[in-house]
Curated annotation (Swiss-Prot):
Gene: clpP1
Compartments where found: Cytoplasm
Entry's Gene Ontology molecular function annotations: ATP-dependent peptidase activity; ATPase binding; serine-type endopeptidase activity
Enzyme Commission number, as recorded: 3.4.21.92
Xref: Pfam families: CLP_protease
Entry protein name: ATP-dependent Clp protease proteolytic subunit 1
UniProt xrefs under PROSITE patterns: CLP_PROTEASE_HIS
Length: 227
């Protein structure tokens, strides 16, 4: 017999049905979210996946195109989180001085620390980027090497043009020596003397010279691990 007054409260049976419907809806939403995440990961490139983990990998010669790309990645990662570390992995023989300095200046401008890692080699301008990482967060892998030297340039033309280009190369040489000196603690005079010719250092020598803070023998600790 039905209730002639019509109770305003749902019966226990109705409550159970509502709970089951809610659980089924939550399950469908969770499955949909999981599928969307899976589809997104399938569409992401390896570079995208690294960037999602705040990792930037610089490989090959440094030139304007890849320097601009690295600068954009650094700026993007800062916009995502102004405090969390960026991890810059370097395997490069160096390249354009101006392209190198574009990356270096951006690294110094960021509010978030940039940890640097030498993987294979960091030579010429790439060594400047390795050295320019956040203090205490510059690393060499055990079998990597670092090489520094004065800027190279080949010019031709009228004598006046050659003189102009030579003066510019000397200016860059002095600027790079000052940058290296400021990060490793050696005098500018010592840097100029050591880099007059190709100056190679293995990982341990790079640490002793003050170019990096330590050798990386295991997986870098995340900020969550440190907390």
């Amino acid at each position: 017999m039905s209730d002639p007054f019509g109770s305003p409260f749902p019966s226990l049976h109705d409550q159970n049905l509502n709970a089951q419907h809610a659980m089924a809806s939550d399950h469908r939403l969770a499955n949909a979210a999981s599928y969307q995440s899976y589809q997104r990961q399938r569409q992401m490139t390896l570079g995208d996946l690294l960037l999602e983990n705040r990792i930037v990998f610089m490989q090959g010669e440094i030139h304007y195109a890849n320097a601009n790309e690295i600068v954009m990645k650094l700026l993007y990662l800062q916009s995502e989180n102004r405090r969390k570390d960026i991890h810059l992995y370097i395997n490069s023989p160096g390249g354009s001085v101006t392209a190198t300095l574009a990356i270096y200046d951006t690294m110094q401008m960021l509010s978030c620390p940039v940890a640097t890692y030498c993987v294979g080699e960091a030579c010429s301008g790439a060594a400047v980027l390795l050295i320019g990482g956040a203090k205490g967060k510059r690393f060499c892998l055990p079998n990597s090497r670092v090489m520094m030297h004065q800027p190279l340039g080949g010019v031709s033309g009228q004598v006046s043009d050659i003189e102009i280009q030579a003066a510019e190369m000397f200016r860059y040489r002095d600027k790079l020596n000052e940058i290296i000196s400021s990060h490793c603690g050696k005098s500018v005079e010592q840097i100029a003397k050591d880099t007059d010719r190709d100056f190679f250092l293995d990982a341990q020598q790079a640490k002793e010279y003050g170019l990096v803070d330590d050798l990386l023998l295991g997986t870098p600790a995340s900020e969550e691990d440190e907390d």
